[in-house]
Amino acid sequence: MKHRWIRIVGAVVLVGAPLPTIFIAQTAQTAAQTDQAPGPYARIAIMRALDGHSVEWEAGYIRHLEWHRQARDTFAWYSYSVWASTERQRWIIYATFGRTAAELSNPVSPVEDERDNLINVLPHAQFLGNAVYEFLPALSRGNGVPTPALRAEYTTVELTQGTGKAFEAALAAEQSKLQGETLWYRMVVGGDTPRYVRLRPRVSLAAILDERADQALPDKVNGLISKMTVETLNLRPNMLVNVTPEPARQ
C-alpha cells in the first residue's frame, strides 16, 4: 500500500494534476482514525506453553502474529510474558486495548484466524482465560491504551460481591494522587466478577521497585478485597502487531 501511494503522489508532481479523489478520501480517513479517541474496551487473554513445547509454541505464535499482519489486522496486539509470579511465571498475556464494542464484534477474518491458530498455536499451548474489560478513566492516569514500555506491573483484584461501587469510589477519590501511568479496567465478561486489573507500564524493573510505595491501595478498600495478586510483566518486542515498543533506557 505504501509503494502504491508513492507512485500516485509522484504522478501528481510530474503532471501537475489535482489529487485523485480516492487519495484524498484515504488520507482523510487515515487522519480521522489517527485522531479518534480510543474505545473503552480491552480484550485480555492468557496462555502458556505446554510442557516441553516452549520452542515450538514461540515459533508458532510468531507465525500466527505474522498472519495478522498479512491479513491487515488494524488492532494493536500486545504480548507480555509474566516474569514475577507465584503461579503464572513464563505465561503469556496478550491483549488489545482502546477498542469499541463494534470493533470487538468484527475482528479480521475470524474463520481464517481460527484456522491459523489451530495450526500454529493450539498444538503447543493451553489457553487459560479470555475476557473483555472496560477502562475506568475516573480511576486512572492515562487513556486506556498502555505505553508499550518494556516492563509493566500487573495487579489483579477480586472483590466480594456487591462492593464494586464502593471500591471504585474509593479509588476515584485518590485519582489525583497518581504519579505515573496507571490504568484500571473492570471485567465485563469472561470470569468471576467483580474483578479488576491495574496495569502500570514502566521503563524498567527498577522503576517498578522504586515506586512500590505507590503500589498500595487505599486502606478503606482492604475489607472489600477477597484476593489481590501483583505480578510483573516483560513486553515481548518480537510478539507485537501494530505496536512499536518504547526504546530501552539506561
Q: What does each of the following model-derived ranges do?
A:
Residues 2-13:
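Bacterial N-terminal signal peptides that target proteins for export
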Residues 16-26:
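C-terminal segment of classical bacterial N-terminal signal peptides
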Residues 25-250:
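Short S/T/G/P-rich N-terminal loop/turn motif that feeds into the first structured element of a domain
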